[in-house]
Amino acid sequence: LVEYIKKVDQTTGTIIALQPENEVGIFQDMDYSKASLAAYGQEVPQTLIQYMKKNRKNLRKELLSVWEENGAKTSGTWKTVFGDNVWSKSFYTTWQYATYIDFISAGAKEIYPLPTFCNCWLVQKPDDMPGVYPNGGPVSRVMDIWKAAAPHIDVLAPDIYLSDFKNIVADYH
């Protein structure tokens, strides 16, 4: 697809960005397939651990509080580092989606180096749990995970259908 876009767009230059996925995520806390459960039992990638350590003072409270409540461990499985809870499953799911979409984005940029973005369906209410909204997408709660996992995504964007425009945009600035 990107090869075709490049071929068609090279003379006009009208394409300004590529969106590898739209409102990514699943409506549950995680994928319970055998492959996913096996991956969930593996170590949290050091890329994420190092990102959290380096950016600890600026991490979103949702990630920071879960990490600190579980001892701010710097190695271990998703359950070991983040606890046996919905948040460890959400963080794991987010990592999987973000690294996959980053892979797609990096490949697209090798063919046609345009900016890429990923948008998300926003959390509607503060007490909504992952899966009420598409879990794994770049909602503000897990934006730090997206930043660590998806360096080839240039913009994380909210898909805004709520009235609190100013605060939502501030979350993504």
Predicted regions and their residues:
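Polysaccharide-binding and catalytic clefts of secreted carbohydrate-active enzymes
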Residues: 2-143
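Catalytic-core region of carbohydrate-active enzymes that cleave or remodel glycosidic bonds
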Residues: 103-114, 141-173
